[in-house]
Every structure is written in C-alpha cells, then in structure tokens.
C-alpha cells in the first residue's frame, strides 16, 4: 500500500467503517515506523505516524470514530468506555484499533490498558467532540 512516498507493509490491524472507509495500522516498509492511515473508497488517503498511545479519525458520515495507537509497556488489551458503554479493541504486534459508534456527538470516557492478568496498566481520558460543520 502506498501513502504518498511511503510504501506501507500489509496492515497489522484494519477496520472498515463509515460507508467503506478502511482504517489501518501498518509499518513503513523501509523505516519500520508505524502509521495510522484511513483509505476512502475513492482511494484518497490521510494519516499520521502511530507513535502515541491514542489517536483517531472519522470520515463522512461520521457514524464511527476509529481510535488506535501503540500499547503502553506491559499492556495486552485495550477497552474504551464512553458514556457507560464499553468497546474492546483489536490488539496485535503492540498496537490497538477499535471502532466506536459516534454519530458526530459529544462523548466522554476513558481508555483502559490492561496486562495479561487483566490488571490496569494505564488509563487515559478519552473524549469525542462534535466535528465542526462547514459554513453555509
């Protein structure tokens, strides 16, 4: 998969959401740096280096927010809790990815990173805010 001048390896993790947009975490074939990339059905792409514990993206119609990132040291599983609802993440090769129903509305919660025994390694606030609307 090519992203600009980058050549990305086969995705480590991938999710489809928002009417066919593909969200992936993949490594740069040359530098091995991880990238979080969204690929629209028309082939247009956007992304950033996946070098933080949490990041995310959504595309029109903003039904689902895709969050992902690197696992903190010692973490083996991830769960996002928003407004009392829990969403377990896919985890592989030190990274995580999860689809969260959003509907372009404000949601507040936390990301929990747990070790193999289910003990909390780290918790971070996780808030989703209404996307800005274009002027009329």
Question: PLM features: residue spans?
Answer:
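Intrinsically disordered, low-complexity prosegments and terminal tails associated
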Residues: 1-136
